[in-house]
Amino acid sequence: MVVISKPLVAVLFVIGLVIGVAVGYAVAATIAPPVGPGAVAPTLKGEVPIGALLPLTGVLSSYGENDKVALEFAEKEINEWLKARGEEWYIKLYVEDSATDPKTALDKLMTLHGKGIKFIIGPMSSAEVSEIKSYADANNILVVSQSSTSPALAIEGDWIFRYVPTDLVQGPAAARVAYDQGVRYLVQVWRGDTWGDGLARATREAFLNLLKKTGQTGDVIEGVRYDPAAKEFSAEAAKLASLITDLVNKYGKDKVGIDAIGFEEMIAFIAAAKAYPILSEVKWVGSDGTAGVSGLVKEADLAEFCIKVQFLSPINAPGASPHLEKVKKAVREKLGRDPEPYAYNSYDGLWTIALALDMVDKYDSKAVKDILPEVVKRYYGASGYFELDAAGDKAFGDYELWIPWRVDGGYDWKIAGIWHGVTDTIEWAPWWTAAVK
């Protein structure tokens, strides 16, 4: 860790980035809030509350559990750093369960706001972010979502920051995975909400563009848009099986694939799909909502189905960083598993808010909002280096391709490759290349 003393009221603490003192002072001065002649800057003292809206229950609960551990780890680090510097304030994290439900998320945001909290990590799903957005904007509540990706929420000047690229980036990743596996007729199954609709659209457009660019014949078929509240999928699986059967009869199973866009309800969907042999004869591609879902590796029959259909789920890849390993270790020790990459974004979200608060030296969401993009630009944390675009979303990124696989007599998630956004190419892991020969 490198700590740079702050001139006047500014400090820039860059995790793991070794820079000279002179450079540090220059950077701090660049984004220091102005203090007029004779003015006395207000100072932070005592408890500084930060809220977190996490899906500790519902269809993103495994992610929520991971991110809670990551946030608690960040809270501990931040407070140790503040104490070592002799600061008179400390971070206090207030976690509420959003239940992966938009209405619950709004209710819990209002609860946190009622306690005077003006800074929030989460919620995770785009449907939740969409629901809370108006209230957050109206009340100057700064929200940092670690995983909301809907392009519909990329709005310049609002109070929502997202430390992940939108699905205008993820869509091409999923399209490339399906295309490179030989799929030319892609049937979509998706969660009918803000996130699912946006990702389905982005993937469809990217896949059709690939077909056009390469001169290949093919199509994207609107398969099943399901209710996000659904718990059982026998009817949806039957409809999907009928569509796939017709396409396989026309074009052959090697050219037909399924684009499955959902959260943990995909466990139940795949369980229903197993009743139709044709659905295990074509390739599947998932999304960031299924990457790392623990329920898909707990049951052997579900894991084997995923292996057979090569169920690769793209999820935004963290950059190389030694701090990633610290967070991963903390989650592994507490929960016995590796976290999804969004846990690293949660960790970085709390750190960057804390750094911005330290710079403005007051509990002022507007002051933090004004400098947060510059803090992020000079920050190097668990998810690596990144910048925010004009809408406050992560501006770029590659995607890891996660898949359930056989590990040590059981099953776990492994990374089969990385999709590189700049070149629209996939770098496959050697183990995966050998496994699918």
What are the roles of these predicted feature ranges?
Residues V2-K437:
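Extracytosolic ligand-binding ectodomains
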